[in-house]
Amino acid sequence: MITKLDKKNFESFISSKGQTIAEFSGAWCQPCQVIKPIIEEIANENPSLQFGEVDVDESYEIAAQYGVKSIPTFLIFQDGELLRMTSQIGSKVHLTKVLTER
């Protein structure tokens, strides 16, 4: 399951225990739409990870706060601490590795 994130729930989401992944995207972003089903598959195959999606048009303040300059961009957190930020996309195998490595 992918949680829709905005300024009301973003901080509590990333502060959750365990690994959380916030994807920054936009409805108009073609690469974001292409990888959406892949992200859903990865989320379903990795139930210990929590996935969330931030629409940069609706929540531009969050994107600015974290320095998101392009989309899709993924921020990976562990227990509320930012581990890494990446805009790497590619095959499902590559994206799974990038998003799930600790």
Regions found by a protein language model. Name each.
Residues 9, 58-62, 94:
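Short acidic active-site motifs
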Residues 29-32:
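Short cysteine clusters
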Residues 60, 66-75:
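Structural micro-motif
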Residues 4-5, 24, 36-43, 47-61:
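Thiol-based oxidoreductase modules, predominantly thioredoxin-like and allied folds used
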Residues 15-27:
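Short active-site neighborhood of thiol/selenol oxidoreductases, capturing the structured segment around
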Residues 76-102:
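Non-catalytic, surface beta->alpha helical segment in thiol-disulfide oxidoreductase systems
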